[in-house]
A protein has these predicted regions:
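An internal, D/E-rich "acidic patch" concept
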Residues: 59-116
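Membrane-water interface at transmembrane helix exits
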Residues: 23, 27, 31, 35, ...
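N-terminal signal-anchor/signal peptide hydrophobic helix marking the start
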Residues: 6-12
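Residue-level recognition of pore/gate-forming positions within transmembrane alpha-helices
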Residues: 12, 20, 43-44, 139, ...
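Hydrophobic alpha-helical transmembrane segments of membrane transport/permease proteins
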Residues: 16-68, 161-178
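Hydrophobic aliphatic residues
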Residues: 26, 30, 38, 42, ...
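Membrane-water interface segments at the C-terminal ends of transmembrane alpha-helices
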Residues: 22-29, 58, 72, 136-165, ...
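Alpha-helical transmembrane segments of integral membrane proteins
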Residues: 2-4, 93, 97-130, 146, ...
Length: 296
């Protein structure tokens, strides 16, 4: 086991290097940088000042020189300084993590509470109205993009019924309701079908047929054997959902102005804040790699 884990960890090194290199390259190919975004449209700022600022930040150096300089800093724990705010990237990033972790935890809990019972119910009521209805709802949930679900929930719960704030009022459970529901609806629609398939596969196995022939009650079969065998699939889905939520909440955090890592990343991308963008890329890469390792 130790050898396998060590082997997988060594395999992660080229993956992380490749991801950071590609993201670094794509940002440079965008055609503008943070200095252009900050001063480019201000006629009062001369080109000499812009060039001097770009040289101060090292943006005038060759691409590979910039990349290896950043990589060297990363290996020593220095992610650099934000081009826009002037603050330490690592400190800023860490300060936003609690909000994203809270949103992720709530979304995973809501996803499990929705997808697992509904998936089991659809499997138990296989080829009946309940099954067809739940599968139809799952299809609709998969088809709707997250931003549309977010706007729909805003319209209903915030604008029409005035039960919840439209935008975040700080890191609180009340402000977390709508972004949590948005993320949970989309993920539950996908995972419900997979839970249904896993449970249905177990229900069709020979040991279930034998248990039914011996007169074992359906509830005992489902709770004692089927769910235990299907738990591997459910736990795998849970692990993958954690990874996708930790790394993929940027749009939802921006819509609801939830002050987390995702919102920080969107602002950094808008302003071409390279050090902050790279921190987010490293975060996403580490999360997905770690989740895949744990799942394996």
């Amino acid at each position: 086991m130790r050898r396998y884990i060590l082997k997988r960890l060594l395999q992660l090194i080229p993956v992380l290097l490749g991801v950071t290199f590609l993201s670094f390259a794509m940002m440079r190919l965008a055609g503008s940088d943070a200095i252009t975004e900050l001063y480019g449209d201000k006629g009062a700022v001369s080109q000499e000042i812009i060039d001097a600022k770009r040289a101060e930040l090292g943006l005038d150096r060759p691409f590979l020189s910039q990349y290896f300089s950043w990589l060297g800093g990363l290996l020593t724990g220095d992610m650099g300084t934000s081009y826009v705010s002037g603050r330490d990237v690592f400190g800023t990033f860490v300060s936003k993590l609690p909000a994203t972790l809270l949103l992720t935890a709530l979304s995973v809990a809501a996803t499990v509470l929705l997808s697992v019972p509904l998936g089991i119910l659809a499997a138990v009521r296989h080829d009946r109205f309940t099954d067809y209805f739940l599968r139809f709802c799952s299809f609709i949930g998969n088809a709707l993009p997250n931003f549309f679900v977010a706007l729909l929930l805003m319209q209903v719960f915030s604008i029409r019924w005035r039960l919840l704030p439209v935008l975040s009022e700080g890191i609180s459970l009340r402000s977390a309701v709508l972004p949590t529901l948005t993320l949970a609806i989309a993920m539950s629609a996908k995972y419900m079908r997979q839970v249904r398939a896993a449970v249905l596969e177990e229900l069709n196995r020979d040991y279930v047929t034998g248990a039914r022939a011996r007169g074992v009650r359906e509830g005992v079969i489902l709770g004692g054997s089927v769910l235990r065998c299907a738990m591997l699939t459910i736990l795998t889905l849970l692990a993958l959902s954690v990874g996708s939520l930790l790394g993929g909440t940027a749009i939802i955090e921006s819509i609801f102005q939830w002050d987390g890592v995702g919102k920080l990343a969107v602002e950094a991308i808008t302003m071409r804040d390279y050090p902050m963008i790279q921190a987010y890329v490293v975060w996403m890469a580490v999360i997905y790699v770690a989740v895949n390792l744990v799942t394996d």
